[in-house]
């Protein structure tokens, strides 16, 4: 792991909470420091996300986001443990990944996992999980999942017909999301799913 942008060192020395973008590529998104494996323009920290984020101290991050990155990470549970370590109590986490119903997700040979409605509930205390309970014994890392938003693919014929109705109702509650994932997701597939979370410490 190598910090390329001196402003990261300055903010850390001043105790200013960082805002980081995991797997940013060269996008350079606003006031977020980009972290990526490749030293591209806009990347502030070069790191292999399958390795510990050793240069970032505990509780040094106030906001973390990641878009279409985690599906490429083989050490997913270990990375989430690192995310938990570096994000401060009350820090905001936003993760966007392809939903498992996205047919294009299976074509990419660099994708090593798929995500659904319940994926991050494996990091949530059983008593705080909605609906179907999932095991939590794989890790002691805990998060609260405050929001989940499913974005439908607009390119399919079924979605073009159903999209206006589904868009209004799909994300109105976890119950409607679960019903869609259980019964409709293969007919009306999603493009991506976004989770809003905070670490539990």
Regions found by a protein language model. Give the residues of each.
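S-adenosyl-L-methionine-dependent methyltransferase catalytic module, highlighting the catalytic core
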Residues: 77-78, 88, 92-201
């Amino acid at each position: 792991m190598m910090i390329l942008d001196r402003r990261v060192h300055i903010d850390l020395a001043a105790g200013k909470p960082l805002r980081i973008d995991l797997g940013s590529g060269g996008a350079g998104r606003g006031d977020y420091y980009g972290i990526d494996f490749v030293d591209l323009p806009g990347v502030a920290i070069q790191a292999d996300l399958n390795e510990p984020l050793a240069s970032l101290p505990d509780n040094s991050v106030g906001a973390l986001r990641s878009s279409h990155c985690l599906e490429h990470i083989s050490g997913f549970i270990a990375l989430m443990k690192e995310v938990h370590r570096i994000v401060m109590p009350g820090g905001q986490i936003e993760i966007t990944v392809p939903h498992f119903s996205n047919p294009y997700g299976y074509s990419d040979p660099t994708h090593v996992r798929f995500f659904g409605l319940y994926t991050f509930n494996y990091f949530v205390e059983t008593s705080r999980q909605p609906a179907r309970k999932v095991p939590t014994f794989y890790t002691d890392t805990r998060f609260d999942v405050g929001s989940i938003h499913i974005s439908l693919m607009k390119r399919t014929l079924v979605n073009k017909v159903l999209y206006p109705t589904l868009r209004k109702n799909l994300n109105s509650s976890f119950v409607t999301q679960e019903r869609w994932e259980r019964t409709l997701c293969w007919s009306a597939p999603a493009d991506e799913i976004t989770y809003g979370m905070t670490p539990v410490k």
